Design a protein with these regions (language model features):
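N-terminal intrinsically disordered, cationic/polar leader segments
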Residues: 3-21, 26, 96-100, 111-113
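Ordered, soluble secondary-structure elements with a strong preference for glycine-centered loop motifs
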Residues: 40-47, 89-92
Length: 118
């Protein structure tokens, strides 16, 4: 994956991990995918999300995260999609498939709606 300071962040760019942090409450390493666009704003949006998700899986399962961040190497991983709004109900099967695939690799997928400042 590319240096995040050289590449734009967001679901539209699968070449960069948008954010890596840790969650002390769960012990998980959290890889965040950022989606600031509303759903259906881009015809290829779900394909872009799929490409980003697959890139994150490769980053973790291919050992790249552990090489780049040795302290995270043996920690549980959560991939978190921070999005502008809840996914559409008609896309539920897509998100369920992603979650099931991640779970089969011992990775948790979480979808979280970003809070906007009032």
């Amino acid at each position: 994956m590319s240096d995040p300071q050289e590449e734009p962040r967001g679901v539209h760019n699968p070449r960069v991990v948008d954010l890596i942090t840790d969650d002390p409450a769960t012990g998980e390493v959290v890889l965040v995918m950022l989606e600031a666009r509303p759903w259906e704003s881009e015809p290829l949006q779900l394909r872009q999300l799929e490409a980003k998700f697959n890139a994150y899986l490769e980053y973790v399962l291919g050992g790249h995260m552990g090489k780049q961040y040795p302290d995270y190497a043996d920690r549980p991983v959560r991939i978190q999609l921070d999005c502008a709004e809840n996914p559409r109900s008609e896309d539920r099967a897509f998100f369920t498939a992603m979650s099931n695939f991640a779970a089969a690799e011992q990775i948790r997928l979480v979808v979280q709606v970003m809070q906007t400042p009032d």
